[in-house]
Amino acid sequence: MIRSLATALSFGTVIPVPASVAAPMGRGAMTALPVVGVVLGGLAAGVTWSASLVFGPVSPLPGLLAVAVLLLATRGLHIDAVADTADGLGCYGPPQRALAVMRDGSTGPFGVAAVVLVIAVQGSAFSTLSAAGSRGIAGIAVAVFAGRVTAVLGCRRSVPAAAGSSLGSRVAGTQPISVLVAWLAVLLFASLAAAPRPWQGPAAVVAAVCAGTLLIRHCVRRFGGITGDVLGCAIELATTVTAVVLAALVRL
């Protein structure tokens, strides 16, 4: 378990992990990925809270700074996946052509638009949550955590890997139902602290998980399976949906 967690931290963050401890990304590391979400969620919540003390609760800067720190802490891994997946979904042709577009180093108009939207919406939602007090700050951490749980769900036993995907072939179909149920239960429990009313947090994370699952299902149909980019895009989508829904609900 320690080796799997070290691998997940090495893959999903800039935290230095000795090569002798980490291993190639696989089933165990994917199971441990939500723990990385806890670390990054705490970081994002801390940055947003600290920045709100400096710039005030109504400024958009706290949330945008938190998103910037997350991009640095993850080496931009998932936001790059958003761009690649958007370009792949936006092109015409068979799955092989779409996958080739995703592997291309350049970013097209769909990718640029998707990245701008994710950063702007996610940052704005984080800022709105920071103005809602301690519950809102907790909601930021829960949103980041929800993204990683969604990635685990995307690797459930029935999901195949896309042809030629290195990461997809190592993690697709590796997660048993027991792991999925366990992480979903933890996420739902954690979400109770993310909003004033007990139903609001669970409603937000359920909406996010459903959105991420629908994206993954569509990508399986379009690409023939999942890739690392698809999982990264699902992480960002679920994080953003959780934050947006919570930002709307905390005002009720």
UniProtKB/Swiss-Prot annotation:
Signal peptide: none annotated. It comes from the Bacteria. Its EC number is 2.7.8.26. Pathway: Cofactor biosynthesis; adenosylcobalamin biosynthesis; adenosylcobalamin from cob(II)yrinate a,c-diamide: step 7/7. It is a multi-pass membrane protein. It catalyses: alpha-ribazole + adenosylcob(III)inamide-GDP = adenosylcob(III)alamin + GMP + H(+); alpha-ribazole 5'-phosphate + adenosylcob(III)inamide-GDP = adenosylcob(III)alamin 5'-phosphate + GMP + H(+). The chain crosses the membrane at residues 5-25, 29-49, 53-73, 109-129, 135-155, 176-196, 199-216, 230-250. The keyword Magnesium applies. Keywords: Cell membrane, Cobalamin biosynthesis, Magnesium, Membrane, Transferase, Transmembrane, Transmembrane helix. Coiled coil: none annotated. It is found in: Cell membrane. This is Adenosylcobinamide-GDP ribazoletransferase. It comes from Mycobacterium marinum (strain ATCC BAA-535 / M). The gene is cobS.
